């Protein structure tokens, strides 16, 4: 579960940049 949460944070950061574009 914890690993999934960490992966989600990474995707969230990447997604944030993509959303900005």
From Swiss-Prot:
<keyword id="KW-0964">Secreted</keyword>
<protein>
    <recommendedName>
        <fullName>M-lycotoxin-Ls4a</fullName>
    </recommendedName>
</protein>
<dbReference type="GO" id="GO:0005576">
    <property type="term" value="C:extracellular region"/>
</dbReference>
<feature type="modified residue" description="Leucine amide">
    <location>
        <position position="21"/>
    </location>
</feature>
<comment type="function">
    <text>May inhibit growth of bacteria.</text>
</comment>
<comment type="similarity">
    <text>Belongs to the cationic peptide 04 (cupiennin) family. 05 subfamily.</text>
</comment>
<keyword id="KW-0929">Antimicrobial</keyword>
<keyword id="KW-0044">Antibiotic</keyword>
<keyword id="KW-0027">Amidation</keyword>
<dbReference type="GO" id="GO:0042742">
    <property type="term" value="P:defense response to bacterium"/>
</dbReference>
